[in-house]
């Protein structure tokens, strides 16, 4: 029974991803990179502001790619689960 809980969480995650589609990415990217930008500006003594802008831009690109890759992987797994579990 120990495997039931993570599986249930994964199912919820997949459902959430599918319901938001790629629209979920901007929120994910914004949250992740806003935190990164805040962290950078807090360390203003070490890094000039234009570095923070570059860091933020890189973060947006990377996080968007990560999010889209995760979504396509989750959707792929979800489809596989349906095709394999519906056998008699």
UniProtKB/Swiss-Prot annotation:
What Gene Ontology cellular component terms go with this record? extracellular region
Residues annotated as coiled-coil are: none
> GO molecular function, one example?
pheromone activity
Q: Note whether Signal occurs among the keywords.
A: yes
Tell me yes or no: is Transferase among this UniProt entry's keywords: no
Q: Where found in the cell?
A: Secreted
Spell out the disulfide connections. Answer: 25-33, 40-52, 59-67
Source taxon at top rank: Eukaryota
Q: Which UniProt keywords apply?
A: Disulfide bond, Pheromone, Secreted, Signal
**Pro-peptide positions?**
69-88
| Biological function | A component of the complex of water-borne protein pheromones that stimulates attraction and mating behavior.
Q: What is this protein called?
A: Enticin
């Amino acid at each position: 029974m120990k495997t039931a809980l993570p599986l249930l969480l994964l199912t919820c995650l997949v459902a959430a991803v599918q319901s938001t589609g790629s629209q979920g990415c901007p929120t994910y990217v914004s949250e992740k990179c806003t935190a990164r930008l805040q962290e950078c500006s807090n360390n203003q003594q070490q890094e000039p502001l234009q570095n923070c802008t570059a860091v933020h831009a890189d973060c947006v690109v990377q996080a968007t790619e990560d999010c889209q890759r995760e979504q396509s992987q989750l959707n792929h797994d979800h489809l596989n689960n349906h095709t394999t579990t519906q056998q008699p």
